UniProtKB/Swiss-Prot annotation:
Domain notes: The CHCH domain contains a conserved twin Cys-X(9)-Cys motif which is required for import and stability of chchd4/mia40 in mitochondria.
Keywords: Disulfide bond, Mitochondrion, Oxidoreductase, Protein transport, Redox-active center, Translocation, Transport
InterPro entries reported in the protein's UniProt record: CHCHD4 (IPR039289)
Free-text function comment from the UniProt entry: Central component of a redox-sensitive mitochondrial intermembrane space import machinery which is required for the biogenesis of respiratory chain complexes. Functions as chaperone and catalyzes the formation of disulfide bonds in substrate proteins, such as COX17 or MICU1. Required for the import and folding of small cysteine-containing proteins (small Tim) in the mitochondrial intermembrane space (IMS). Precursor proteins to be imported into the IMS are translocated in their reduced form into the mitochondria.
Transmembrane helix found in the keyword field: no
Full protein name: Mitochondrial intermembrane space import and assembly protein 40
Residue segments, region Disordered: 101-146
Quaternary data: Monomer. Can form homooligomers.
Bias (Low complexity): 123-140
Gene that this polypeptide is encoded by: chchd4
Length: 146
């Protein structure tokens, strides 16, 4: 016969060998596809946006969370030929909000994406010759005999 013993906040359950030999009568509950706490991707099975998805990186919360939700929802549900083209104002509102909080939403700096020294600083001797230049050079080195 099994029994429980309470020790502080813990409940220790003691079971007998006979308890373990009997088949389990536990009923498994089928997963609820609309359970907001269940792990889902960005889009829930019913087509709604999962605002709890870690893939959003917390953008749905915070001072610009509502603007993000408005813009993202508009894009997700957009029926325009160019998806999201009807959402420009929503994204503009989100961008304006984010610019008010640069410590939370840092702007990408154009200088960070360019290689050091600028784009046009490669020495010319390291540039590959074009195929026509190499063909012309080969023709002058090995003139055809007639």
């Amino acid at each position: 016969m099994s029994y429980c013993k309470q020790e502080g906040k813990d409940c220790i359950i003691f079971v007998t060998k006979e308890d373990h030999e009997a088949p389990s009568n536990a009923e498994l509950v089928e997963d609820d596809p609309n359970d907001p706490y269940e792990d889902h991707g960005l889009i829930l099975p019913n087509g709604d946006i999962n605002w709890n998805c870690p893939c959003l990186g917390g953008m749905a919360s915070g001072p610009c969370g509502q603007q993000f939700k408005d813009a993202f929802s508009c894009f997700h549900y957009s029926k325009e030929e160019i998806k999201g083209s009807d959402c420009v104002e929503n994204f503009r509102g989100m961008q304006e909000c984010m610019q008010k909080y640069p410590e939370l939403y840092p702007q990408e700096d154009d200088n960070d994406s360019a290689p050091s020294g600028g784009a046009n600083t490669a020495p010319t001797d390291s540039l590959p010759a074009s195929s026509t230049d190499s063909t012309a050079a080969a023709a002058t080195e090995n003139p055809a005999t007639s």
